Structures are given as C-alpha cells and as structure tokens.
Amino acid sequence: MLVIEGLTCRFGSKAAVDAASFSIDRGSFVGVIGRSGAGKSTLLRMLNRLAEPSEGRILFEGVDVTALQGRELRQWRARSAMIFQQFNLVGRLDVLTNVLMGRLAHVPAWRSLAQVWPEKDRALAMSALDQFDIAPLAAQRADQLSGGQQQRVAIARALVQEPDLILADEPIASLDPRNTKVVMDALLRINKHFGITVLCNLHSLDLARSYCDRLIGMANGRIVFDGAPAELTDSIARELYDLEADDVMGSAPVHAPIGALVPQLGTVAA
C-alpha cells in the first residue's frame, strides 16, 4: 500500500501541493484530475522523489520513501516508474535501446555505458515492445516515430523496470484521439494483467471516468475530491475545473476496452 501523509511542496511562499493525504491499495488505477496548475504534476514528481517534499511523508509497504538516499533512492525510482508527457526518449538511439534503459537499475554501469545488454534483458525488452504492437520498430530511431508510438515505447521502458507503481504525468496531453486511446489502453492493460498500481494525471474527465477506478481531484494544491468516478457529479466537476470545465467535459466518453490480449511479459495478476 502507498500512504501519503500531509505531503507538501513549497516554491517560495507558494504551496504547489498543500498537505495532501491519501492511501492507495496495490493494483488500483487512480486518476488525478484538476485544472492546469492544480499541483498534479508536482504530486507525482514528489512520489518518485524527483521533487523534494517540504513536509509530510510517503510510505510504501511501511518504508519511509521520503527518507531514502543513495542506492535505496535509485531503487525506489526504479520501482516507481515515471511516464512523462514529453516521452523522454533518446531520439538518436533505436527503440530497443531506449526500452533497455529501463533496466539500468538491474545491470552494472559498464554494461549500460558499453550498451552490452544481457540476452535476458533484450528478450524482456522485445517482449514489452510486443505487448504494445511496436516490436517491428525495435531497430528504428526513436525520433522517427509518431507521438503515439514514442509514448508506447516510454510505457514499454517503464514496464521493463518491473515496477510496483507507474506514475503517468499527462501521458496523452499531446496525442490525437486515436493515439490517446491506444496509450490509455496500454496503461489499463499493465494495470489489469500485471497488477501494477497506476497513478495517472489526466485533464480529460471523460478519460478519467472511463479508465480509472478512483479519482483524486486537486485544486490550488489541495485534494478536494477523492472517490469513485460515479461520485464525481457534473456540479462537483465544474467547481473543480472552474473556467476550464466546458473544455474538459465537452467531449464524448472514450470507453475502456472490455477485454485485452493475454500478456507475455511478467506475472499475470490473480
């Protein structure tokens, strides 16, 4: 279980996240929603320790994540894989090598520097690419891919980290509707088939309601809603999004898939 206690992040006198407290059970798919600047990205970056909390604690399975340093902190960052809006791929490297970067915490430094990857890791990376129908692109440069393809590569890279938790920060913000569905389906597949907890920042309420089993709403750095998607009424949503409400509530729902293919990578969730 992930437990957040009074988590706060200040930049000068402004609190980007203000006393956030909640807990998340293993295997959940949680959407973090709210208008731009609500504190969603800062919250996820604190959970991965890319941003340092000013106050509060992050506990995972009883371990105080906020106290981790050095090797233990690097191990935590591998266990809590980040997926970014900007993809964060190395454009000049091929797709397979970009995915293998997710194995950095599992191999000696000289192997990654020399790009001499163990065969088992290469097989793992290819299996991850195959999960998202991009294995044929393994030898292609990352900067030659479409935005949707690049985000699927980033998700495959996160999966080979063998994480307990995936933190997706606006993963579909720059994508068209077709690629948005492909990427959200990929995250749902990871969650349902591998039992990996997913915490995903989303701007679209339709997507959040379709894919997530729980929503956490933020406004001005504070958590103002925490519940099932069905509990988020339009009136609450309009208060949450204020002037942006018409933009995030105006499109038709994108329904989550009823079924998915049997995975080939890792352990299937019970």
Swiss-Prot record:
The gene is phnC. Keywords: ATP-binding, Cell inner membrane, Cell membrane, Membrane, Nucleotide-binding, Phosphonate transport, Translocase, Transport. Its EC number is 7.3.2.2. One of its GO terms (molecular function) is ATP binding. ATP binds at residues 34-41. It comes from the Bacteria. Residues 2-245 form the ABC transporter domain. Part of the ABC transporter complex PhnCDE involved in phosphonates import. Responsible for energy coupling to the transport system. One of its GO terms (cellular component) is plasma membrane. The keyword Cell inner membrane applies. It is found in: Cell inner membrane. This is Phosphonates import ATP-binding protein PhnC. It is a peripheral membrane protein. Coiled coil: none annotated. Transmembrane segments: none annotated. Belongs to the ABC transporter superfamily. Phosphonates importer (TC 3.A.1.9.1) family. It is an enzyme of class 7 (translocase). The complex is composed of two ATP-binding proteins (PhnC), two transmembrane proteins (PhnE) and a solute-binding protein (PhnD). It catalyses: phosphonate(out) + ATP + H2O = phosphonate(in) + ADP + phosphate + H(+).
